[in-house]
Swiss-Prot record:
InterPro entries: HAD-like_sf, HAD-SF_hydro_IIB, HAD_sf, OTSB-like, Trehalose_PPase. Belongs to the trehalose phosphatase family. Transmembrane segments: none annotated. PANTHER family: TREHALOSE 6-PHOSPHATE PHOSPHATASE. Mg(2+) binds at D35, D37, D213. GO terms for molecular function: metal ion binding; trehalose-phosphatase activity. Pfam families: Trehalose_PPase. NCBIfam families: HAD-SF-IIB, T6PP. The active site is at D35. Substrate binds at D35, I36, D37. This is Probable trehalose-phosphate phosphatase.
Length: 265
């Protein structure tokens, strides 16, 4: 029975944790794609408040080497910010849900920032200046409105972002996440970013494992499932999710990564 069949037929989707532990016997045939917030790192009240456990960058770097470099971060964060989080380790990254990407060979692809979009971001900051707890995050070619500290503002903020999307035009799309609404380039999604990596060495020819925690990760779940890979969600199983398995928490995933990184294989 294949690992994928086991995940699909298991009564407890938490079998994903056992599967990742089994990677140690077949690292040469897998590629690993990891979301950051809520997946590698615990969610925080604001984007800048996330804490990176001191040992995590080195654990990821060791695991990447065991995978022959076939480990990439796929995140809503921008490339530069993601690099700061895991410095001095350096990985292929798809940022802004795929609007930015650094290939394994170091080439960087970025969406263009326009003057009109810069003005729109400034208007969003001004419109929410008196909304205590609401945070507008400038991501360059994307903008996110966070309401984790102001949940009562959700409806108003969603309406404001729909207005902003109309102003931005057809080249942009709205993305909902955990206590956040984001406007990003319409052509960008995590599924396409994973597919692009899988067309390049060292990812090419390997089966993909995608791990995420949010609706923003569903696109990469669908992509890896379609390609015969495995999708794993952080948190309790959710019937509406495309994920084939689950791991209870970001802390549990970090423990698995640390264990894999330490194996003498």
């Amino acid at each position: 029975m294949s690992c994928q069949t086991q995940l699909l037929s298991a009564s407890e989707a938490a079998l994903g944790e056992d599967f990742l532990s089994a990677l140690s016997t077949d690292l040469d045939n897998w590629a690993l794609f990891l979301d950051i917030d809520g997946t590698l790192l615990d969610l925080a009240e604001t984007p800048d408040a996330v804490a990176v456990p001191p040992s995590l960058p080195a654990s990821l770097d060791h695991l990447s080497k065991k995978l022959g470099g076939a480990l990439a971060l796929v995140t809503g964060r921008g490339l530069d910010y993601a690099d700061q989080l895991f410095s001095p380790a350096n990985f292929p990254i798809a940022g802004l849900h795929g609007a930015e990407r650094r290939d394994p060979d170091g080439r960087v692809h970025k969406a263009a920032e326009t003057a009109d979009f810069e003005r729109l971001k400034a208007e969003l900051v001004a419109a929410t200046a008196s909304w205590a707890g609401v945070l507008i995050e400038d991501k360059g070619a994307a903008v996110a409105a966070h309401y984790r500290l102001a949940p009562d503002r959700q409806l108003e903020l969603e309406q404001l972002m729909e207005w902003a999307l109309y102003r931005a035009g057809p080249d942009w799309a709205i993305q909902h996440g955990k206590m956040v609404v984001e406007i990003r380039p319409a052509r960008a999604n995590k599924g396409d970013a994973v597919a692009a990596f899988l067309g390049q060495p060292p990812f090419a020819g390997r089966r993909a494992i995608a791990i995420g925690d949010d609706v923003t990760d569903e696109a990469m779940f669908r992509t890896v499932n379609r390609l015969g890979g495995l999708s794993i969600r952080i948190g309790p199983p959710v019937p509406a999710s495309e994920a084939l398995g689950s791991i209870p928490s970001a802390e549990a995933l970090r423990g698995i990564i640390a264990a894999l990184a330490l194996l003498n294989i």
